[in-house]
Regions:
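Long, contiguous binding/interaction regions
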Residues: 1-58, 64-88
């Protein structure tokens, strides 16, 4: 049986890579526009799903990133945007 300490390794990501962010917002149009304004580069944005009550919509945003720092910066910038409720 594996122990928790056996999983204490950082995942190695090879860059450049296309990274998928799951972005959730209340207004579909504003959420898409927010993703586009934050990334400011070619981004494939696809609708993922709507919450059970219809209040939230989620999108997949596939973006080419060239480093860990760039990937983290995009994540933080998406999180800070007023029209985005959550980023995974």
């Amino acid at each position: 049986m594996k122990e928790l300490k056996d999983f204490d390794q950082k995942v190695q990501i090879e860059y450049p890579t296309i990274w998928r962010y799951k972005v959730i917002g209340e207004n579909a149009r504003k959420t898409r526009e927010a993703i586009e304004s934050v990334t400011n580069r070619p981004t494939t944005i696809t609708f993922s799903k709507q919450s059970n009550r219809g209040k939230y919509q989620s999108f997949n945003a596939d973006i080419m990133v060239h480093s860990e720092e760039e990937r983290e910066k995009i994540y933080q910038d998406l999180k800070k945007h007023e029209d985005i409720k959550m980023v995974l």
